[in-house]
Amino acid sequence: MLLPLLATAALAATDVTLQTEDGTKVHALVEASKDAEKGVVLVHMVGRSASDWSYLSEKLSRSGQSVVAPDLRGHGKNVPEDADVEIPDEDWAKMVQEVQASVKFLRDKGVKEVSCAGASIGANLCLRAAAEDPEIVNLVLLSPGLNYKGVKTVDAIQAYGDRPVLFVASEDDNFAFRSASVLETKATGQRKFQILKNAGHGTKMLNRDPGLEGLVTSWLMGTYELSSGQLVAPRPRNAEAVAEDVKTTGEKLQSHQ
């Protein structure tokens, strides 16, 4: 079946500077949707940047959500172009503060319901941030791990409790696939493990599997219908939005290279 995904006017992406709890200043891309009550934080992979999320960010913004995509410390516009940056081991766990600063930014703008989506270490960081913040309402984890540079997730998924979470991993990405399998068994709320084939790792899967962007968007928007018939979260409340069709059935979407 098809469920409507609401669409509304979005503002162009803007560059902002966020300050974390330890005083680190980081760059972030923001796509604001006017009067949005829902928002999403998007967190990139190691060696990548906020721009990896540009297409998904625009889609979410046009669907009525405000979006913040931070550059993690030592990444993106936080460092000179083509610089050879060595990130201290102790800084990896501190990167959860970038997620927290992004969540705070959205709440300060009036967003009431914040979700997080991350890829690879970004998935780990989102899960850890949500474990510490019971007001984060929803998660999407692309290629999560169990422990990367001290950013652990098994205890975090248990602390996350009964909130919704979407796991996505490709069978050819053995470590992430096994990690997601472990985490899925420990999740206690609404959950789905989307298994892809030959789709690679992290945000690369969004390029290699045409159905994935629609699944992620509908999960974050709360229009995804589980096989039980339940919706993942409340529908967006923008009464003046224009509907567009997005596939949101509870069946596994077909995977493509």
Predicted regions and their residues:
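Gly/Ala-rich beta-loop-alpha elbow adjacent to hydrolase catalytic centers
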Residues: 117-126
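Short beta-strand/loop motif that positions the catalytic acidic residue
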Residues: 160-161, 166-169
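Catalytic histidine-centered segment of alpha/beta-hydrolase-like enzymes
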Residues: 199-209
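N-terminal cap/lid segment of alpha/beta-hydrolase-fold proteins
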Residues: 10-32
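Alpha/beta-hydrolase active-site loop
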Residues: 86-109
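The serine-hydrolase catalytic nucleophile loop
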Residues: 46-58, 179
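Conserved alpha/beta-hydrolase
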Residues: 60-82
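Short beta-strand element of the alpha/beta-hydrolase
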Residues: 37-45
